[in-house]
Amino acid sequence: MSTRCITPFYKKLEVVNGVTTGYVPFPCGKCPPCLRRRVSGWSFRLVKHGEQTKSALFVTLTYNEEKVPKTKSGLQTLVKADLQKFFKRLRKLTNEKISYYAVGEYGDKSERPHYHIILFNVNHGIVEAAWRIDSVDIGHVHFGDVCDASIGYTLKYISKEKRIPTFNGDDRAKEFSVMSKGLGANYLNERTIKWHKRQIEERCYLPLKDGKKASMPRYYKDKLYKDGEKFRISVHMQKVSEEWADNLIQSIGEDNFNGKLAERHINEFRRMAKKSKQRQKL
C-alpha cells in the first residue's frame, strides 16, 4: 500500500543565489498515506528505543468506578494530569531513566476513559504502586508484551478519527497522546549517519530488517540534514514522483492515469471512514 501523500501542499522554494526553482510538494500530514507514514515512523522509533533499555512493558491503566473522573455534566472523562502524576510517582519509585509513549482514549463500547502506555525501564510492581494514591488503587493495571501488535494498538490513535465532542454539551476532554523526548534517538550513531549522508537523496529512508524501506520521520530528518540537504531531497523526490507519473501515463494513457489516481484517492478515504465506523461498532 502506497505511502505517497495524496493531498500535498506546495511551497515555492528558492536556491541560495535567488533563482526560483518552482514548486515542491510537501506531505499534508492528514491523508491516509500520511497517517500510515506517521504510524510507521513512530513504530520504528519505539522498536529502536527498546533496543537500548533494560525492559519494556505494554501497560493499560483504567479507573475504578468510584475513582473515574467526571465532567461538570456528569460524563466520564480523561484527565491528562492523572497520567502526568502517574509518571511523576513512577520516577520517585525508581532511579532508572523512565521513558514512554502514551495515549488517553475512550472505550469503543463503554466510552470509559483509559490509558495505553509503551513504558521503558520499569517493572510490574513499580507500575502498580504508582497507580495508587495513599495506598488506595486508582483502578486496574493490565500488562502485556511490547511487540508489533501492542505498538500498533497504541499507535492506532494517530489514524483514529477524533470523536470528541460527539454531541452538543459534550464536555469531555479530547483523546490525546504524550511521549518522552528523544525516543529512538539511539538509531542515529556514527555508522548510520555516515550511511545516510553518503547518498543524501537516495538514502532518505529507514532500512527495515526484511529488506523493505520505511519513510523517514521528520525527527530524524531534522537531526541528519541541513536545510540545503533537505532541499536537495525534496527536489529529488519531486523528480522521482514526476518520473513515476510520466512512465505510468505512457503505459496506460493520461485519461486512464487520471481516472486511476482519482479512484485511488477516493478508496483511501473510504477505507479510513470504514475503519472508523468499524471501531465505533466494536
Report each predicted region and the residues it spans.
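Intrinsic-disorder/low-complexity loop/linker signature
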Residues: 17-19, 51, 62, 73-74, ...
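A broad, low-specificity signal marking well-ordered, structured residues that form hydrophobic/aromatic
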Residues: 29, 57, 100, 141, ...
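Signature for HUH/AEP ssDNA processing cores
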Residues: 38-109
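Conserved His + Asp/Glu catalytic blocks
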Residues: 97, 107-113, 117-244
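C-terminal non-catalytic accessory extensions
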Residues: 238-282
